[in-house]
């Protein structure tokens, strides 16, 4: 039954893709006019607000998250701009998942009493170097990871195959937008309305950029304090004058 449903869904996706291909060839689709003019077009919000007078001509506000900032001219070439947009969205989505995975176990362990083998994200991963290895999902009944080199090699191979399939336009995604495929990737139909879809694109990239900065901050915190982000936040709230970024930075300055 499940296989039949999946097959029917896949057939539907291919039929819809064929219909799109048979129709008029689509170019870059501009967002709906009523989708929040504050985020798109020439009158959108700029990175310096009213002081953003001379934004690059190639940043027209056509794409989500365009605040008219490109002082280094990295996106002046259209093909480069297209590649960077794709890379940013993909990394933003990974960062959103990563931030959720970093925060959730520590939150549940600290405030809900949920038992984890190790709730702190970098300490959990470090268990692969222990004698017993790393238990997937914290369950000894599942397969153990005991060799970091083998684990990395498997990840590189699997992710490389998937990314290669995606980049080269595998037949399963034929006719679909590589960044916003929809169809089976939107089972709840959240993007059916064009205005809502345009707004969701902006929300995704804004939150994704915050998530990328957050993950970088989690890495730095782990190196400097040896604690997870939730514990660092609790320490800061308990004693802001002692536990803050400036105090932590002094640990790396030459002593008098």
Curated annotation (Swiss-Prot):
Binding site for chlorophyll a 3: 127, 137, 204
An example Gene Ontology biological process: photosynthesis, light harvesting
Residues bound to chlorophyll a 4: 207
Binding, chlorophyll b 3: 163
Residues involved in chlorophyll b 4 binding: 155, 166
Alphabetic keyword roster: Chlorophyll, Chloroplast, Chromophore, Magnesium, Membrane, Metal-binding, Phosphoprotein, Photosynthesis, Photosystem I, Photosystem II, Plastid, Thylakoid, Transit peptide, Transmembrane, Transmembrane helix
InterPro entries to which the protein is assigned, alphabetical: Chloro_AB-bd_pln (IPR001344), Chloroa_b-bind (IPR022796)
Free-text remark on how the cofactor is bound: Binds at least 14 chlorophylls (8 Chl-a and 6 Chl-b) and carotenoids such as lutein and neoxanthin.
Sequence positions that bind chlorophyll a 6: 236, 245
Transmembrane parts of this sequence: 94-114, 142-162, 210-230
Transit peptide: 1-23
Amino-acid positions noted as binding chlorophyll b 2 in the UniProt annotation, renumbered to this chain: 93, 143
Binding sites annotated in the UniProt record for chlorophyll b 5: 155, 252
UniProt topology in membrane: Multi-pass membrane protein
Binding site for chlorophyll a 5: 203, 221
Binding site for chlorophyll b 1: 47
Chief location of this protein within or outside the cell: plastid
Assigned protein family: Belongs to the light-harvesting chlorophyll a/b-binding (LHC) protein family.
UniProt xrefs under PANTHER family: CHLOROPHYLL A/B BINDING PROTEIN
Swiss-Prot/TrEMBL domain comment: The N-terminus of the protein extends into the stroma where it is involved with adhesion of granal membranes and post-translational modifications; both are believed to mediate the distribution of excitation energy between photosystems I and II.
Complex and partners: The LHC complex consists of chlorophyll a-b binding proteins.
Name of the protein: Chlorophyll a-b binding protein of LHCII type I, chloroplastic
Species whose genome carries this gene: Chlamydomonas moewusii (Chlamydomonas eugametos)
